Each structure stands twice: as structure tokens, then as C-alpha cells.
Amino acid sequence: MLASRALLAKQAAAMLVRQPACLMHHGGDWGNWGNTNIAVVFSGCGWWDGTDIHEAAYTMYHLSRNGARFQIFAPNQQQMHVMDHMKMQPSSSDNRNMMMESARFSHGQGMMQMNDLSKLDANSFDAVIFPGGHGIVKNMSTFSKDGKDCKLNNDVERVLKDFHRARKPIGLSSMAPLLACRVLPSLEVTMGYERDESSRWGRWPNTNMVQAVKSMGARHNTREPYEAYVDEKNKVISTPTFMWETDYHYHYIFDGIGNMVKHVMRMTAK
């Protein structure tokens, strides 16, 4: 009898190992499974001149894992410049469109999956998420030139105000809280640490942005890169992610995005 039970247990375990991950894990207990529609807004493709590829991919992964449907959007306009990510300097011979660059995230389905930000209607979605990257301060706003007095891309400003007015969740990672704090009143956000407390694990080189959001009237809350801060009143969820520069602790960024998405999904169910 014991031998038979052991054999059955072994066979059951073997069957589970062969099952696709999606059959073993149906996501979190957040949102309306399979019926939550999220708009994800990109600003190009690449940390130094658009949306960071890790933050973009992690956002789409966690949305998928939690049963959300999502569509990707970007402004149909030219980038401020194109950065050579090897030399860390602008390329003088290149000029690229944010929407065309963001289509790189569409798994080769740009014509079907990529959307012009000017067409984004808050009435058609349950929430919006802005992953980070220097496109936030170069393409979606003039922060890289004007600092705290920056202006936002017209459609970026409209979308943020529309979702806020509709009491729908807004997810923001790394630099993206700058956008919301510039045009929405009395927000509570996190962009990580307020001082560059460098360690052998990483550092916080963009604390000037933290001071900027505070000068815009927002309340800043210190959080680790793997955490999220939830402004329940305004339904704004932020996570520091790559405000923290690290050479290899990317799992912290993955977890930070996951926590942000979890709370976005939770709030869509309210």
C-alpha cells in the first residue's frame, strides 16, 4: 500500500512538472481577472532617451501575470535626441519618433498593438501606467531643460488629468512621478531616497528630482527600489525602481514593478 501511494505521488509530481506555468499559477487576487484594461504609456525605447526596457518588460509581465489586458501608447512625435548607449552621448546623425521606437516593445506587432497617445481615452481603460526612463524628462516633459518649472507634452498632461478626474489608478515608476506631480495637486509619491546614500549594492544619483517633486507641492516618501508607495486618496501608486542605479540587483526592480502593478490592480477592483 505504501509503495502504491509513493508511486502515485511520484506520477502526480511528474504531471505537475510538465504543466505550463499558467496552469499552475493563475495570478494574484487583484482586479477583475481577464477583464481589467490597462493603458501603458511609453516614451521611446532605451533608458537614456526613452522608456527603460526592463521597466517596460517587467510592467507588461506583471500585468499579464495578474490577468490584465493592456494596450501600449506613445506620443507620435520626435524624441529630444537619440543617445548612443555605448558612448553615453547624443548621436548627432539620428532623429527618431517616440511611437516608432516604442513599437519595439510590441513583439513585432506594432501595427496592431502600438497606439498614438492622442487617441487614449480614459473612459476605455481602468488604469494607466507610465514606466520610467529618461524619456520622462526629455520627451514627455521639458524637465531636462527647465527643471521644476517644466512643461508636459499636451497629451501626457491630458491623460494624467483625465484618469485622476475619473478616480482611476495611475501607476508610476522611477522618474515618472515627476509628470503627475507637475500637473496634479497634493500627491504623495516615492522616488526612492532623498540623498545619494551610495553603497556597494548601488546608488541614488538623481535625488535632484526628489527635491523637484517636493517643490511642486508633493509629499515625498522614502522607499526601497523593490517597494511601492500608495497614495490611496489620489489613487497614485509609485515605485523607485531604477532611480536606484545597480549593476546586477535587477530582481529588486522586478519586485518594485510587481508591487506597483499589484496595487494598481487592487484599486481597479474598488
From Swiss-Prot:
Highest taxon listed in the record's lineage = Eukaryota
> Which SUPFAM superfamilies does the record cross-reference, listed alphabetically?
Class I glutamine amidotransferase-like
Q: Tell me, according to the record, the phenotype of the null mutant.
A: Morpholino knockdown of the protein display decreased eye size and formation of smaller mitochondria in cone ellipsoid photoreceptor cells.
Q: Which GO terms describe its biological process?
A: mitochondrion organization
Q: Return the Gene3D superfamilies for the record.
A: 3.40.50.880
Summed up, the tissue specificity of this protein is: Expressed specifically in the inner segments of cone photoreceptor cells of the retina (at protein level).
Key word NADP present: no
Q: Which InterPro entries match?
A: Class_I_gatase-like
What role is this protein assigned?
Answer: Plays a role in promoting mitochondrial enlargement in cone photoreceptor cells in a fusion-independent and ATP-dependent manner.
The name this protein carries in UniProt is ES1 protein, mitochondrial
Q: Which organism is it from?
A: Danio rerio (Zebrafish)
The encoding gene is es1
